[in-house]
Amino acid sequence: RRASRGCAPQVSHFTAFPCLGPPYPAPVRKVGAPLAVIIGLGTLAALILSLLTAVNPAGTLLGFALATAAMVLVLACYLWLDRWEPEPPRLLVLAFLWGSSGAVLISIVVEMLIDSSLPGRTAGAEATGSFVTVAVAAPIVEEAAKGLFLLLMMTGRRRAELNTLTDCLVYAGLTGAGFAWLENIVYIGNGEGVSSSLAVAGLRLILGPFAHPLFTTMFGIGVYFALQQRGLLAKVFFLLTGYAAAVLLHGLWNGSALMGAGTYLGVYVLWMMPIFALIVTLAVASRRRERHIIAAQLAPMVTHGLVTPVEAGWLGSLPARRQAVALAKRDGGRVAGTAVKRFVQAVVELAYARDRIDRGFGDARLFALQHDEVARMAAARMEAGPALYRLGGYRPPSG
């Protein structure tokens, strides 16, 4: 099919771009919206069920308000991390909704089955069973349930969205944030009174708002390294290692809570906080690397006439991008601003596809993706043509 257009089936660099034929938009899967509706309705049903069965309705409402406030803060951090190559909003929403519905439902059902299979409840067996359920079974089940979304992201066209470590961290974090949001509502709502609910909220929302996102991040890191491998065994190794790290971290967190305040605070200060600081450092470094990838790919794009030198000047800076979109919107209205945004996104996606090829991961699927991204970029340029023409003399702000 490629040969009929005069292109070789495999290419080495941007020199193949001029023969890619007429532009056409990248295909969009139409199952996303119905799936989002289904998962969203499931989340809503879970919330309604929590309210109807709550022992403390006032505490549940309080939990909803406080958990939502904490969740907004967590999401804001991940959206900041996702600025250089913003992920499709529909997939971000699906990640959060999966965490707050599908993962929660799977965890509840499986943990109930495990709990019912434990031996009879003598005084000693009760304590042992509780520890096994909370510190062993729950981490194993919940991290697997949350991780299913990341495994789904590794399939089909969704794989093209996992370009960098940042992408894996963002999807893992949003899935964990969704799970934590609903779990926090339930735990806070189970307090015997408002004071009890506030105490639980303090422990969960002040000390551990990033707990579940952090656990799932371990698997997200495993997914990223698995995607960098060629062999199946290597991929499986990194996936299992990431999953084991998520389970271990989750188990230590849950187990320490059962062993008294001293143990809990010790694990929190000596184990959780250093790991959290390490992940934050890793995330910021990955975000910085995204900027460098785009900057490195803009130069060849200029050489091959895909972008102009002026465009390359503002495409490599987040503040300059925002200002360019704002200028386009001011001069040409919302349509012009949206068109320039799409052009920016197309350039970024092409840069990441090209980066993977340059790092030696070029195969038929990736070259086909590059073909699609070039065509999408050409279509976006045509749509944004008048706005880009008006930006022809634009220079990014200095500093």
Residue ranges: model-predicted function:
Residues 5-7, 11-399:
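Hydrophobic alpha-helical segments at protein termini of multi-pass membrane proteins
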